[in-house]
Amino acid sequence: MAAAALRSGWCRCPRRCLGSGIQFLSSHNLPHGSTYQMRRPGGELPLSKSYSSGNRKGFLSGLLDNVKQELAKNKEMKESIKKFRDEARRLEESDVLQEARRKYKTIESETVRTSEVLRKKLGELTGTVKESLHEVSKSDLGRKIKEGVEEAAKTAKQSAESVSKGGEKLGRTAAFRALSQGVESVKKEIDDSVLGQTGPYRRPQRLRKRTEFAGDKFKEEKVFEPNEEALGVVLHKDSKWYQQWKDFKENNVVFNRFFEMKMKYDESDNAFIRASRALTDKVTDLLGGLFSKTEMSEVLTEILRVDPAFDKDRFLKQCENDIIPNVLEAMISGELDILKDWCYEATYSQLAHPIQQAKALGLQFHSRILDIDNVDLAMGKMMEQGPVLIITFQAQLVMVVRNPKGEVVEGDPDKVLRMLYVWALCRDQDELNPYAAWRLLDISASSTEQIL
């Protein structure tokens, strides 16, 4: 192969040709490498030689280049650190910093010296005042002042004793006792009406039947005679304006859109919207039948025929504090006699059947109510039994049923259930007492496990 290169004058294998003593004259770049022109040592025949390197660096050459670059970087970093140290040294030795340190030390020493002087002056002043008071107490004027102070103290003590005795005498008088009782009654009413709204749920001390009274509060309530004249003003169907009003509500686009927005607002679960409903409920009451069906007006009118003092807010408060606790506690504890008194026959049979089966197996009810809230009036409806008001509310319960051995057979004592109830309460028109007139006509419930 070297002989062929010598004959042609060009070569692509420089190592072998160099071993033969051939010298290079020139080189040319070709697509697959480099070609070198060569001649013999005597110089009479030019030769060419090609070397294909592929323009690639070897592993060692690349490693050496990387080492050189790292050394250059380290050198630059060392120079930067050296410059930084030189600048820090110059700043440390600058006149401005030295002057600032001297001023700081001067201020600190002056502060310590001033504190010591003030402490000494205060001690001297205290000693002078003590000596002056001692000298004044020895003089006639000081003795008179001391005696006057002691006399004033005795007089004040005697006055306090007199006021205390007078207060005891006043407290024993009939007028003061009557005033105190009045104040306590007002305080109790305020606590019941205001604080009772936000307080935690408390189980009734005794579950009462519908026909019983829980205390003097119910006995003192005035029972009205039936009033045959309707006190509520309702637009009658025979009125010439009724058909126009009906057409307006059914065909007006703006009114229907507004009514749809009102329904979405009432059904929203947003916390902010739920908190603002207290104000809008008042507005709805003022607007009357604009957002309520005619059937609700008929139901309220029928109730007012028997109970002219009926009020929606007071009715909801009665449900929250009296009706719901008694009925719901009887349901979860298996008090069948209480349920039978509060419920209609069909509702009682529906609720009593599982309770009777559990008692037949010897099971015991250990459920409890944690809270009752969000009591609201959903709608009204006229039924054969009488006017019906449908209420909704939420309750937090812990449902537990145990066998005679104490083992839990149903429920979980560590799990809180949030129940959504829908109750239909019917007004017994034959019962004049409002606290014994409402009976449970129907019930519906759904439950979800409360995580927090």
Curated annotation (Swiss-Prot):
**Could you tell me one molecular function GO term of this UniProt entry?**
ATP binding
**In terms of one coarse class, where is the protein primarily found?**
mitochondrion
Q: Which SUPFAM superfamilies match?
A: NTF2-like
Instruction: Kindly list the positions at which Phosphothreonine occurs in this protein.
Output: 128
One GO cellular component term, please give it. Answer: mitochondrial matrix
Q: How does it assemble?
A: Probable component of the PAM complex at least composed of a mitochondrial HSP70 protein, GRPEL1 or GRPEL2, TIMM44, TIMM16/PAM16 and TIMM14/DNAJC19. The complex interacts with the TIMM23 component of the TIM23 complex. Interacts with SLC25A4/ANT1 and SLC25A5/ANT2; leading to inhibit the presequence translocase TIMM23, thereby promoting stabilization of PINK1.
The UniProt function text for this chain reads: Essential component of the PAM complex, a complex required for the translocation of transit peptide-containing proteins from the inner membrane into the mitochondrial matrix in an ATP-dependent manner. Recruits mitochondrial HSP70 to drive protein translocation into the matrix using ATP as an energy source.
Q: What is this protein called?
A: Mitochondrial import inner membrane translocase subunit TIM44
